[in-house]
Regions:
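Bacterial N-terminal signal peptides
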Residues: 9-18
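Pocket-flanking alpha-helical
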Residues: 70-101
């Protein structure tokens, strides 16, 4: 009996030494490094969320890299990157590739953004309907010059889906990115630019209220791109934004995703004027304008 107890005691010591010598995991959801691609439209907001996350979890180091929507999605579907925050959903071709390759990339909707029409701060225009924007984009109207970012941007793809019936916007002046759209509109006083809400809010340009055709059910009502109208679907040019995550195990990518979709992350989304998609948020009452 004593011999058995002695052997058991030695075994316990060996197990204690073995497990005691094992190093704790180097990376967890709140400890480690992450490279995260971010759509240019969403960069200011995501940067603020990253700063908040890093303050709460100081053992994380997140590098944000600004890219176009198409570039980010292609890299994710090819398995080249861990995380991308996108201003648009996958196109039909991208969905087919996703299904064909049995991709393990997780896709999580986290907020609602607005396609915004901006003009010079002194421009007489205050509102516009979607039909007018469509005619400008297709070249059927020359009343204003209209600037949009290039075909790799989320804006370009969103416009094809939401406004031009998948036709190329041959009437638009296509520039490098959303920042360039802002620069062109500031120089060209008789122009309209189409950018994401984050970019519009930082541009010091006038943001137009958007309405639908006067003959439609909601005709005559114009909406500003306020968070409440984005979340409830009333703003005419809404786009859902997504997190694409390609991470095996639970590491910083998973932790950052959880934070973005948590009440803390969604409050930051709201503070930037976008509509939260994962938690219920109270909004200030907004009066519709005609």
């Amino acid at each position: 009996m004593m011999n058995y107890l002695h052997k058991s005691f030695i075994l316990l010591i060996i197990l204690f030494v073995f497990f005691g010598c094992q190093e704790p995991p180097k990376e967890t959801a709140t400890k480690g490094n992450l490279k995260c691609l971010v759509d240019e439209s969403l960069y200011p907001m995501v940067s603020a969320i990253k700063d908040s996350f890093s303050l709460k979890y100081p053992e994380t180091k997140i590098e944000l890299v600004k890219v176009k929507a198409k570039e980010g999605i292609v890299k994710m579907l090819n398995g080249e990157e861990t995380m991308f925050i996108s201003s648009r959903a996958l196109t039909e071709d991208e969905v087919n590739f996703y299904d064909k390759t049995k991709s393990q990339v997780k896709i999580i909707k986290f907020c609602y953004d607005a396609l915004t029409a901006v003009v010079d701060s002194n421009h007489k225009l205050n509102r516009i309907i979607t039909t007018e924007l469509k005619q400008l984009l297709l070249g059927n109207s020359k009343q204003y010059r209209i600037y949009i970012p290039d075909q790799n941007s989320g804006i370009f793809e969103n416009l094809k889906v939401d406004l031009t019936d998948k036709q190329n916007p041959k009437g638009a002046y296509i520039v490098k990115n959303e920042e360039e759209v802002v620069k062109r509109v500031k120089k060209d006083k008789n122009s309209i630019g189409l950018v994401g809400l984050n970019v519009a809010n930082n541009s010091k340009l006038k943001i137009l209220r958007i309405g639908t055709d006067e003959r439609s059910a909601t005709g005559g009502v114009y909406y500003e791109p306020a968070a409440g109208y984005l979340a409830n679907g009333e703003y005419p040019l809404i786009r859902a934004c997504f997190i694409l995550l390609n991470e095996i195990g639970v590491y910083v990518g998973s932790g950052f995703t959880s934070y973005i979709t948590s009440s803390e992350g969604q409050k930051i989304v709201l503070s930037y004027g976008l509509g939260p998609a994962t938690v219920p948020i109270k909004y200030k009452q907004i009066v519709r304008m005609r």
